[in-house]
Swiss-Prot record:
Domain RRM: 532-606, 891-960
Gene name of this polypeptide: RBM26
Modified-residue entries (Phosphoserine), positions: 127, 496, 518, 616
Coiled-coil ranges per UniProt: 719-795, 823-847
Basic and acidic residues composition-biased segments: 106-118, 134-168, 187-201, 209-227
GO function terms (MF aspect): RNA binding; zinc ion binding
Cross-link (Glycyl lysine isopeptide (Lys-Gly) (interchain with G-Cter in SUMO1)): 106
Bias (Acidic residues): 968-1000
Biased composition (Polar residues): 228-241
High-level lineage: Eukaryota, Metazoa, Chordata, Craniata, Vertebrata
Protein name (record): RNA-binding protein 26
Length: 1007
C-alpha cells in the first residue's frame, strides 16, 4: 500500500502540495491538494499511481503535469515535504499578529499540537485586536496544554463531530444580540463573560477547536466521507441552556443557504479563517497579505469556499454550508427563524405552515415528517447523551429540519426503528435511475466511513434526488427555519407545495418502482427473459389507437396482444410481443414512440395493476382490490374500472364472450379497427385474428368513440387527398387534350382560310381543281365543327368547379391575384404561372359579367327591336316584335395587331363592353377570338374597343365557315354595314331616353 507505507504526515504533505500547486494552477490550491492527496492514498503501485496522477491532473495542470508528478513522488520518497522539527519563526509571527501580547507570551518549545492550538486561537482572535481578553485566554490555554494533548490526539484519530461547529455558531449567535456596542468590544466581552460563567465550557471549547481544524476544510474535499461533518444547522440558543443542540438530517445532494441574523457582528471572525489554515504549520508560514475582493462572491452573491476563501467577502458575508457542487448557481439567502423575539431590524418569524418566501427560487415543498425508510445520515454516534441519535428520532418539538430532504443514492444500511405514528410509507422517493436527473457516479457509499480510508474515483460526485414531493401535513418547528434546496430542484419553476398546483408524478409512482414495505432501499427489479409485455404511459388520446401503435411496434417483432386505454387510463396501453428479445428491442429503441418523446415505455409487471391504480393521478374513482380473473365476467359498468389481467388465454376470453355486453364491446373494437379483418371471418374471429388478446381488453367507451372518430377522420383525410390528386391529374390531362384539339382546330381554320382565299383570287381556276378544293373545304368544315363541339364540351367541365364561386369571391380572388402579380413583378421574380392564372380568372370573370363596366342601364338589353316592357317601343324594331327575331349574325370578334405585353390586358379591355362567353388567344400568332353574349355587345366592343393603349387594333367578325356562295356573302355584308352605321348612335342618346322614362314614371306614380 503506497499511501500508508510512504506518506508519514498527511498534513505536512497537504501543505507542501498547496504551496507547490499555487503558482502553477488556476484552481483552488487547497482543494486540488486534497484531490492529489486522495489520488496518492490509493492502494496501487508507484508506477500505477504516477500514471493515474498524470491522467487525472492533466486537466488542471496541463503542461506542468509531468513535472509536478515527478516532483511529488520525489518529495514523498525522500520525505522532503516534512518540515524541520522546530519553528523559530512562529514566535515572531505571533508577535506580529498580536503586538499587545509581546511581553506576556511565554517563549517555549512548541510541539505540533501546540502549534495547531495557537493557530486556531489566532484565527478566532484575528480581526478585533483586544489584548486583555486574548491575553487571559492564552494564559489559560497555556496552563491547560498538557491536559489537552492526549485528548487532541484522540480527536485526530477519530472522525470529528458536527456539534462543535454548531457550538461555535450558537455562541456566535448569542454574542450577536448586542447591536449597540462596537463589533470588537461586544465580541470580547461576551467571550469573557461566557468563560467566567463556566470554566468547564472553556475547557470543552478548547477541545472543539482542535477538531475544527479539520472541519474548516473545503466542502468538496474528495476524501470527505463522514456525513456528520457535511452540514450543520444553526439553531437558536436558549440563554440558560448551553448544550441543547440537535443534529439535523441533511444530505450531500442539498445546499443550505444561511444568512445569520447577526450579520453585522460576525464579519471578520467567520471569514478570516482561511489564510492561516492554508499555510503550512512549519517554516512555510508567511505574514498575511492584504486581501483582494472575491470575484465569485461579487458575481454570484456567495462563495462556495465559505470560510476557506482567501479573498475578502466584505462586511456582510453570506455563509454557505454543505456544498459539493462548486458550480452551483447563486441562490438568495434566508435568515433562520429563532425562538423568542427576533433581533432588531428583522421581521418576526413566519407563521406555521407558511410556504417559503416568493423570492426563493425554486420554491421548496412545505414542511413535513421524514419517512421511516430514511437512514440517519447525520447526528453523532450514540455515546453522547445530550444529542439525539438522528433528526428522524428527535421529538416533534426538536430543532429538526422543517423541510423534507431527499435520500442520497446507494445507501444500503438499515436505519434504526422509527416511530410509525409520525410518518407515512408512501411519501418519499427511492433509489433508482431518474432519466431527468441522472447521477454522474452511481457508486454505492457506506453511511459511516473513516476519513483516512475514504477514496473517491471522481473529483466531484453528484447524487440524484427529486424534491417534487406531495404536501406534508406536519407543521414546521418553531425553533428553527432551515431552507434546504436540492441540487436537482434548481431546474424546477413550480413548487409542488403551492396549493392548487398539481405535483409532478414522483419517481416511486413510476410503473417499475418496487414498492415494498421494507425499511431499506430495494435494488432495481431485474426482469427475466420471460417478460414480453411493455406498458405505455402518457400516450396522447388521438395517438392511442390500435392502428397507430401496431404501425410503430410491429417493426420490432410479432405483436401477440395490444391493449389501448389500458388500466382505465385513456393515455395508457399494453403491448405484448412474441419473444423477450423483440420486447427488449422495442424498449431499447432510441426512436421516440409515434414521434412523441413524452410517451414513456416500461416493462409490464404482473400484479402491479392495483398498486398503479392507487398511485395514478389519472384514475379518479376509488378501486377495490379483488381477484383479477373473475373481472372478465362482470358487467360493462364494473369492467370500466380495473382492467382484466392480460394472463387470460384466448380460449377463456372466448368462453367469457358469451355475455351480451362483451359482444357489444367487441363490436366497438371491430369498428375501432376500421374493419381491418377479412369479411369472411366472424366478429369474434376478426378481433382475435387481428390481435390475439383483444377479447381480453375492456375499453372505456368514451375513449373508444373518440379514437374511432379520429381514425375515421384520418382515413377520410387520406382518401380526400388521394381523390384530390387524381382529380388534379385528370384536369391536367383534360387540359392537355383540349389544348391539342385547339391547336388542330386552329390549323384546320388556317387551311380553310387559305383554300377560300385561293378560290376567291383564282377566278380562272379549272373546274376540276375547284371541285377538289370544295371537297377539301367540306371535310375541313366538318372537322372544324366537330372539334369546336368537343372543345366547347370540355370547356364547361373545366370551369365547372370555379363557377360555384360567388361574384364577391371571384372579385376578391381576382384582386388578390393581381396584387400578387404586381408584387412579384416589382420584385423581379418569375410571373409566368401567376400571369396565366390571372388571365384565366379574368376570362372567367368576363364570362360572368363581373368585369363589365356597367355603362348605363340596360346596356345588355339594347338589341335591335328590344322590348322595354312599357308599351312605348322606342327601340329600332323595324316593325318586327323583339321576341320573334332570331339573330344569326356573328358575335365573335377576331382581334389582331396587339403586342405580347398587351395580351394580358386585352381581355379586361373588351370585358367592359359586355359579357364575354369565350376567349381564345393564340400565343404564337398574337391572334385572339372573343365571343360576346349578344350581338349588340359585340358591336359596341367593335365600335369603342378598337382603340387600345394608344394604338388601333385590327377587328373583324369571326364568321363560322360554311359552304356558301359568294353571292350570299355579298348579300350579308351590306346588312352588316347598315347595322354598324345604325349602331353608331351615341349611347348618351339612349341614356337620355332612359332618364326621360324615369321622369314620366315618377310623375305617373305621383299622380
Amino acid at each position: 500500500m503506497v499511501s500508508k507505507m510512504i506518506i508519514e504526515n498527511f498534513e505536512a504533505l497537504k501543505s507542501w502540495l498547496s504551496k507547490t500547486l499555487e503558482p502553477i494552477c488556476d484552481a483552488d490550491p487547497s482543494a486540488l491538494a486534497k484531490y492529489v492527496l486522495a489520488l496518492v492514498k490509493k492502494d496501487k503501485s508507484e508506477k500505477e499511481l504516477k500514471a493515474l496522477c498524470i491522467d487525472q491532473l492533466d486537466v488542471f495542470l496541463q503542461k506542468e503535469t509531468q513535472i509536478f508528478v515527478e516532483k511529488l513522488f520525489d518529495a514523498v520518497n525522500t520525505k522532503s515535504y516534512l518540515p524541520p522539527p522546530e519553528q523559530p519563526s512562529s514566535g515572531s509571527l505571533k508577535v506580529e499578529f498580536f503586538p499587545h501580547q509581546e511581553k506576556d507570551i511565554k517563549k517555549e518549545e512548541i510541539t505540533k499540537e501546540e502549534e495547531r492550538e495557537k493557530k486556531f486561537s489566532r484565527r478566532l482572535n484575528h480581526s478585533p485586536p483586544q489584548s486583555s481578553s486574548r491575553y487571559r485566554e492564552n494564559r489559560s490555554r497555556d496552563e491547560r496544554k498538557k491536559d489537552d494533548r492526549s485528548r487532541k490526539r484522540d480527536y485526530d484519530r477519530n472522525p470529528p463531530r458536527r456539534d462543535s461547529y454548531r457550538d461555535r455558531y450558537n455562541r456566535r449567535r448569542g454574542r450577536s444580540r448586542s447591536y449597540s456596542r462596537s463589533r470588537s468590544r461586544s465580541w470580547s466581552k461576551e467571550r469573557l463573560r461566557e468563560r467566567d460563567r463556566d470554566r468547564s465550557r472553556t475547557r470543552s471549547r478548547s477541545r472543539t477547536r482542535s477538531r475544527e481544524r479539520d472541519l474548516v476544510k473545503p466542502k468538496y474535499d474528495l476524501d470527505r466521507t463522514d456525513p456528520l461533518e457535511n452540514n450543520y444547522t444553526p439553531v437558536s440558543s436558549v440563554p440558560s441552556i448551553s448544550s441543547g443542540h440537535y443534529p439535523v438530517p441533511t444530505l450531500s445532494s442539498t445546499i443550505t443557504v444561511i444568512a445569520p441574523t447577526h450579520h453585522g457582528n460576525n464579519t471578520t471572525e467567520s471569514w478570516s479563517e482561511f489564510h492561516e489554515d492554508q499555510v503550512d504549520h512549519n517554516s512555510y508560514v508567511r505574514p498575511p497579505m492584504p486581501k483582494k475582493r472575491c470575484r465569485d462572491y461579487d458575481e454570484k452573491g456567495f462563495c462556495m469556499r465559505g470560510d476557506m476563501c482567501p479573498f475578502d467577502h466584505g462586511s456582510d458575508p453570506v455563509v454557505v454550508e454543505d456544498v459539493n457542487l462548486p458550480g452551483m448557481l447563486p441562490f438568495p439567502a434566508q435568515p433562520p427563524v429563532v425562538e423568542g423575539p427576533p433581533p432588531p431590524g428583522l421581521p418576526p418569524p413566519p407563521p406555521i405552515l407558511t410556504p417559503p418566501p416568493v423570492n426563493l427560487r425554486p420554491p421548496v415543498p412545505p414542511p413535513g415528517p421524514l419517512p421511516p425508510s430514511l437512514p440517519p445520515v447525520t447526528g453523532p454516534p450514540p455515546p453522547l447523551p445530550p444529542l439525539q441519535p438522528s433528526g428522524m428520532d428527535a421529538p416533534p418539538n426538536s430543532a429538526t429540519s422543517s423541510v423534507p430532504t431527499v435520500v442520497t443514492t446507494g445507501i444500503h444500511h438499515q436505519p434504526p426503528p422509527a416511530p410509525p405514528s409520525l410518518f407515512t410509507a408512501d411519501t418519499y422517493d427511492t433509489d433508482g435511475y431518474n432519466p431527468e436527473a441522472p447521477s454522474i457516479t452511481n457508486t454505492s457509499r457506506p453511511m459511516y466511513r473513516h476519513r483516512v480510508h475514504a477514496q473517491r474515483p471522481n473529483l466531484i460526485g453528484l447524487t440524484s434526488g427529486d424534491m417534487d414531493l406531495p404536501p406534508r401535513e406536519k407543521p414546521p418547528n418553531k425553533s428553527s427555519m432551515r431552507i434546504v434546496v436540492d441540487s436537482e430542484s434548481r431546474k424546477r419553476t413550480i413548487g409542488s407545495g403551492e396549493p392548487g398546483v398539481p405535483t409532478k408524478k414522483t419517481w416511486f409512482d413510476k410503473p417499475n418502482f418496487n414498492r415494498t414495505n421494507s425499511p431499506g432501499f430495494q435494488k432495481k427489479v431485474q426482469f427475466g427473459n420471460e417478460n414480453t409485455k411493455l406498458e405505455l404511459r402518457k400516450v396522447p388520446p388521438e395517438l392511442n389507437n390500435i392502428s397507430k401503435l401496431n404501425e410503430h411496434f410491429s417493426r420490432f417483432g410479432t405483436l401477440v396482444n395490444l391493449q389501448v386505454a389500458y388500466n382505465g387510463d385513456p393515455e395508457g396501453a399494453l403491448i405484448q410481443f412474441a419473444t423477450y428479445e423483440e420486447a427488449k428491442k422495442a424498449i431499447s429503441s432510441t426512436e421516440a414512440v409515434l414521434n412523441n418523446r413524452f410517451i414513456k415505455v416500461y416493462w409490464h409487471r404482473e400484479g402491479s395493476t392495483q398498486q398503479l391504480q392507487t398511485t395514478s393521478p389519472k384514475v379518479m374513482q376509488p378501486l377495490v382490490q379483488q381477484p383479477i380473473l373473475p373481472v372478465v365476467k362482470q358487467s360493462v359498468k364494473e369492467r370500466l374500472g380495473p382492467v382484466p389481467s392480460s394472463t387470460i388465454e384466448p380460449a377463456e376470453a372466448q368462453s367469457a364472450s358469451s355475455d351480451l355486453p362483451q359482444n357489444v364491446t367487441k363490436l366497438s373494437v371491430k369498428d375501432r379497427l376500421g374493419f381491418v379483418s377479412k369479411p369472411s371471418v366472424s366478429a369474434t374471429e376478426k378481433v382475435l385474428s387481428t390481435s390475439t388478446g383483444l377479447t381480453k381488453t375492456v375499453y372505456n367507451p368514451a375513449a373508444l368513440k373518440a379514437a374511432q372518430k379520429t381514425l375515421l377522420v384520418s382515413t377520410s383525410a387520406v382518401d380526400n387527398n388521394e381523390a384530390q390528386k387524381k382529380k388534379q391529374e385528370a384536369l391536367k390531362l383534360q387540359q392537355d387534350v383540349r389544348k391539342r384539339k385547339q391547336e388542330i382546330l386552329e390549323k384546320h381554320i388556317e387551311t380553310q382560310k387559305m383554300l377560300i382565299s385561293k378560290l376567291e383570287k383564282n377566278k380562272t381556276m379549272k373546274s376540276e381543281d375547284k371541285a377538289e378544293i370544295m371537297k377539301t373545304l367540306e371535310v375541313l368544315t366538318k372537322n372544324i365543327t366537330k372539334l369546336k363541339d368537343e372543345v366547347k364540351a370540355a370547356s364547361p367541365g373545366r370551369c365547372l368547379p370555379k363557377s360555384i364561386k360567388t361574384k364577391t369571391q371571384m372579385q376578391k380572388e381576382l384582386l388578390d391575384t393581381e396584387l400578387d402579380l404586381y408584387k412579384k413583378m416589382q420584385a423581379g421574380e418569375e410571373v409566368t404561372e401567376l400571369r396565366r392564372k390571372y388571365t384565366e380568372l379574368q376570362l372567367e370573370a368576363a364570362k360572368r359579367g363581373i368585369l363589365s363596366s356597367g355603362r348605363g342601364r340596360g346596356i345588355h338589353s339594347r338589341g335591335r327591336g328590344a322590348v322595354h316592357g312599357r308599351g312605348r317601343g322606342r327601340g329600332r324594331g323595324r316593325g318586327v316584335p323583339g321576341h320573334a327575331v332570331v339573330d344569326h349574325r356573328p358575335r365573335a370578334l377576331e382581334i389582331s395587331a396587339f403586342t405580347e405585353s398587351d395580351r394580358e390586358d386585352l381581355l379586361p379591355h373588351f370585358a367592359q363592353y359586355g359579357e364575354i362567353e369565350d376567349c381564345q388567344i393564340d400565343d404564337s400568332s398574337l391572334h385572339a377570338v372573343i365571343t360576346f353574349k349578344t350581338r349588340a355587345e359585340a358591336e359596341a366592343a367593335a365600335v369603342h374597343g378598337a382603340r387600345f393603349k394608344g394604338q388601333d387594333l385590327k377587328l373583324a367578325w369571326n364568321k363560322p365557315v360554311t359552304n356558301i356562295s359568294a353571292v350570299e356573302t355579298e348579300e350579308v355584308e351590306p346588312d352588316e354595314e347598315e347595322f354598324q352605321e345604325e349602331s353608331l348612335v351615341d349611347d348618351s342618346l339612349l341614356q337620355d331616353d332612359d332618364e326621360e322614362e324615369e321622369d314620366n314614371e315618377s310623375r305617373s306614380w305621383r299622380r
